[in-house]
A protein has these predicted regions:
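Basic/hydrophobic alpha-helical interface regions
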Residues: 1-169
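Negatively charged
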Residues: 141-251
Length: 251
């Protein structure tokens, strides 16, 4: 009986946390119809990361078309882009697009944002990445700027890519943001992508029929096999506003 009560109280605690995160999201986005899945495991790893992820999810939905961006990512992955690297790059660009906007609208978020990025650096980058891991070095450079409150000196090549991330903050529509993500992927991650697979126009021209016929099972857990495409699009769309490495967040 004691164990049952304990299980119940853990469930109650999780539900309470879910409600808190959900309410915060709704408040920031101003959209109370937003379908939100709060990440309680992440909250237990770092309160600030979970809340900041949630706030950013709400803010992104307010300023941009999250479904259009999610579909772009899935189409690019369909054409053999690296899921992990493309998602990680998109996450960084989304941070560049809405991070500062949220802080200007709600000054209280600034401290939470800094603490969230500090927690990610502490938990994921105990040792600095090697020189050839450009995306990780770019992520660290952007995080350090936010934490310091000013642009920090970095090498010329890295600075040029970092400037592109900051250009995301000036974007007015989703397609503009997609262009920056696509350009950065084809420069930082896979300089041969366009030659092998085609331009952004080719990516966006991938049809729903092509996507539906593709076997997304390799990218999903077994219980998600049914309606695989729909589940995969949902999974990518949910993950793209995060910044942390989800594999470190245990249930």
């Amino acid at each position: 009986m004691h164990n049952q009560t304990e299980e119940l109280s853990i469930e109650d605690y999780k539900l309470d946390l879910e409600n808190r995160i959900r309410n915060l999201l709704w408040t920031v986005s101003g959209d109370y119809t937003l379908d939100v899945k709060p990440d309680v495991s992440l909250f237990l790893r770092s309160r600030e990361i979970a809340l900041y992820d949630g706030i950013k999810q709400g803010a992104f939905a307010k300023y941009f078309d999250k479904n259009l961006l999610g579909l772009y990512l899935v189409k690019k992955i369909y054409l053999d882009a690296s899921e992990a690297e493309l998602t990680s790059l998109a996450q960084l660009c989304i941070e560049g697009a809405v991070g500062e906007k949220i802080c200007e609208e709600r000054p209280g978020v600034r401290h939470m944002r800094k603490k969230a990025l500090e927690d990610i650096l502490d938990q994921e980058y105990e040792t600095l990445p090697s020189y050839d891991r450009l995306l990780d070095r770019l992520k660290i450079a952007v995080f350090r700027d936010v934490i310091a409150g000013s642009v920090q000196p970095v090498e010329k090549k890295l600075a040029a890519f970092r400037d592109r991330i900051y250009e995301c903050g000036k974007t007015e529509d989703t397609m503009e943001l997609i262009r920056i993500i696509d350009n950065l992927y084809n420069t930082v991650i896979d300089p041969d992508f366009e030659k092998k697979k085609g331009s952004l126009e080719r990516v966006m021209a991938v049809t729903l029929e092509e996507l539906t016929e593709f076997g997304w099972e390799d990218y999903l857990n077994e219980e998600m096999y049914e309606d695989a495409l729909e589940n995969y699009v949902e999974k990518i769309t949910e993950r793209m506003t995060d910044l942390e490495d989800a594999s470190l967040t245990e249930d």
